[in-house]
Structure formats: C-alpha cells, structure tokens
Amino acid sequence: MAASQQQASATTSTASVSGPGSAGGSGPQQQPQPPAQLVGPAQSGLLQQQQQDFDPVQRYKMLIPQLKESLQTLMKVAAQNLIQNTNIDNGQKSSDGPIQRFDKCLEEFYALCDQLELCLRLAHECLSQSCDSAKHSPTLVPTATKPDAVQPDSLPYPQYLAVIKAQIACAKDIHTALLDCANKVTGKTPAPPTGPGGTL
C-alpha cells in the first residue's frame, strides 16, 4: 500500500514538473514571422541595377558587347544574302534554309548605335554640369547614382538649388547694372516699361 502511494505521488510530481506542453499539450503557439525584406545580394543587385540605369557610362559599357554581337550578325547575314543572290544570278540552286533579313539586322545595329550616341551625349552633358558645378559651387553635392557616398562637407540638394537661384538672381542684377551704366554713358534713356494697355 505504501509503495503504491509513493508511485502515485512520483507520477504526480513528474507531471507537474513537465508541464502541460511536454505532456502532450499544445503549449504556447508561435507567432507567424513577417516576410523578410530584401537584404544581402538581392538588395545589392537591385541597387546596382538602378545605378547602371542612372549612369550613362555603365550603360555604354553594357551596350558595347551587344553592339559587337549585332555587328557580327550583320556581317554574317550580309554574306549569306550575297551568296544567295549570286547563286540565283548564276542559275544555281540556293540553300533551302531560311536566311535572316538584312534590313532588320541593319535596323537593330543602328538602334544600338543610337543608344550609344545618347549615352555619350548624356555623359558629356553630365561632365559639363559637374565641371560647372565644381567651378561655381565648390561644395560637393551627392549624386543620384551614389546617394550613400555623402561627405560631411557636402551640400544638400535643396540648399544647392537655393544657391543656384541666388547666383541666377545675382547675374540678372549684374546684367541690369551694366545695361544701366551703358545707357548712361551713351546718353540713351531706357525704354519706359509697358503694361497690358501699352505705354504707361
């Protein structure tokens, strides 16, 4: 009798220690994890793609292999068409296989050339603007292709716009002052301002 009571008390203590979760119970349910954001290689690849879209030099480098391949295809199709036309003129049987159209290959080649020309023009314009910005506003401005490369002495873009507007207003004031001085030297009177109804 005493042994059975000890065995029952041991079973009760084991159940109380293990708890409802380990004795076949459901236990606390885990909350569903939110979907993970793009991190690591996926995010870096997306950022690199955006930089390539913005940077005309990177775009130019990407188009060069395509241009080489298009030129090789164009020369190959031109040779095939020339051989076929020569065989037809000589009364010989031409190849039965389909031959690509020369005009479509030439159009694709010219389209790539136009894209390369636009990239070069855009790169030249960006270089000119960068030189003018460095000349008239020595403070650096973060670019769209490298937004993270912000230096401590860089100028925010809204403040940069304010500086440019102030420079434009100053240039207009200088132009007006020089024009007034030239009119005074030559003795010419400036033209009276005109309103909507004519001369005031």
Swiss-Prot record:
Protein name per its UniProtKB record: Mediator of RNA polymerase II transcription subunit 29
Function per UniProt: Component of the mediator complex, a complex that can either repress or activate transcription. Mediator complexes are essential for basal and regulated expression of nearly all RNA polymerase II-dependent genes. They may act as a bridge, conveying regulatory information from enhancers and other control elements to the promoter.
GO molecular function, one term: transcription coregulator activity
Modified residues (N-acetylalanine): 2
Cellular-component GO terms for this entry: mediator complex
Keywords: Acetylation, Nucleus, Transcription, Transcription regulation
Disulfide bridge map: none
Pfam families given in the database record: Med29
Organism of origin: Bos taurus
Subcellular location: Nucleus
Main localization of the protein described in the UniProt heading: nucleus
Family statement: Belongs to the Mediator complex subunit 29 family.
The keyword Metal-binding belongs to this UniProt entry's keyword annotation: no
Biased composition (Low complexity): 1-20, 36-48
